[in-house]
Amino acid sequence: WGLVTCVYNLGFAAFLMRTPDSDRLPAGAAGLVFFLLLVTEFNDVAQYVFGKLLGRHKIAPTVSPNKTWEGFLGGWLATGLLIWFAGPLFTPLAGYGLLVVAVALPLAGFAGDVTMSAVKRDIGVKDTSHAIPGHGGVLDRADSLTFTAPLYFHLLALFALGKF
């Protein structure tokens, strides 16, 4: 399971670098990867900030006790807006395709975060590191990416097919 998560799912981000350069890619293949990393990490931080500022209602208390509905919804909205406004600068997405990505990617990031939290709890790893205060370790930085990378890749293929 760990091999699939780390190699297969995260491999989608690396595969984006093989996208041929085109005038339809505003920032090139590297821009596609940068945008994925930007919105995934922004979503994590936005959920954390909204949760700390407004969080009252736990969303998954047994798996991730610090996650709240307020953090989830605030992060989802903030990240969706970031995708909507910054997406055209980095991707060939527009209109309906961009809207789908703006709605779906923050949801996938949250799902990846909660799923990896559940896996860590199952194997008895409570905290992976204290390297980034308030954010845990490397696994905590990449957990959302395990779900956002394949989704982003396939949504790009679906909505921008023939556009890059």
Residue ranges and their predicted role:
Residues 1-47, 51-61, 68-164:
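Hydrophobic alpha-helical transmembrane segments
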